[in-house]
Curated annotation (Swiss-Prot):
Pfam families: EI24. HAMAP family: CysZ. GO terms for cellular component: plasma membrane. GO terms for molecular function: high-affinity sulfate:proton symporter activity. NCBIfam families: PRK04949.1. It is a multi-pass membrane protein. Its main location: membrane. The chain crosses the membrane at residues 31-51, 75-95, 151-171, 222-242. This is Sulfate transporter CysZ.
Length: 253
């Protein structure tokens, strides 16, 4: 079935909302199951453990607040909780994406074929097995780009004042951009678009991608909803690829 998507790009919020609709399309649901199971098992267990630890971690983080900011503690405490949720949520969503990367790529490929009527070159389990080394190499590229930037931001958390005020905002913006890269990369990688070229393409529509990544980041922090976010984000990012990038970067049509 060829999609009714227009070629006119929409906002990142629109594509995120489309993701929730697309995962339910007949013929697509079976490709959603494996990414969904990985996310439910990993994120469900991780967040259950996290909420048992918050009573210890938050007071420790608040101990870095200098005396002159103590009067703002009632505002800083929620920021500290959000900071922990952001860092923790992104860390475990990264692990989940590593494990599910081949299946996310297959989901993006099948959805793109359904939206455009195009025929992908290799499909099914044998196509996945053949592409696993390349897919894992691509995940390493993303991780190598992400890690040094994440370390710098994490160091900011231990600077009194900055760690409880500025750092959470910077981390949220960074997470939004990184999640846009993470999920938009699946359709780009299906067409063998180099990682650097993919980032350059995303920067041409930075606001759209930041909107998409910000909503994905927010939903990653929400219990229960975060269990479904991986396949939803893959579908939303694939819809964005079809509208905004496919004409210029597609390898198969």
């Amino acid at each position: 079935m060829v999609s009714s998507f227009t070629s006119a790009p929409r906002s990142g919020f629109y594509y995120f909302a489309q993701g929730w609709k697309l995962v339910l399309q007949p013929g697509i649901r079976r490709f959603v199951i494996l990414p969904l199971l990985v996310n439910i098992l990993l994120m469900g267990g991780a967040f259950w453990w996290l909420f048992t630890q918050l009573d210890v971690w938050i007071p420790t983080l608040m101990s870095y607040v200098p005396d002159w900011l103590q009067w703002l503690s009632y505002l800083l405490w929620p920021l500290a909780v959000i900071s922990v949720l952001l860092v923790f949520g992104y860390f475990f969503s990264t692990i989940a994406n590593w494990i599910a990367a081949p299946f996310n790529g297959l989901l993006a490929e099948q959805l793109e074929a359904r939206l455009t009527g195009a025929t992908p070159p290799d499909t099914g389990i044998f196509g996945i097995m053949k592409d696993v080394p390349r897919i894992m190499k691509r995940e390493w590229q993303k991780f190598a780009w992400y890690l040094p930037r994440a370390i710098v931001l994490l160091i900011l958390y231990f600077i009194p004042g900055i760690g409880q005020t500025v750092a959470p905002v910077l981390w949220f913006l960074f997470s939004a951009w990184m999640l846009a890269i993470q999920y938009c990369d699946y359709p780009f990688d299906n067409h063998k678009v180099p990682f650097k070229e993919m980032r350059t393409a995303l920067r041409t529509r930075k606001i759209t991608n930041m909107q998409f990544g910000a909503l994905t980041s927010l939903f990653t922090m929400i219990p229960l909803l975060n269990l479904f976010i991986m396949p939803v984000a893959v579908c939303g990012a694939t819809a964005m690829w079809v509208d905004c990038y496919r004409d210029k970067h597609a390898m198969w049509r």
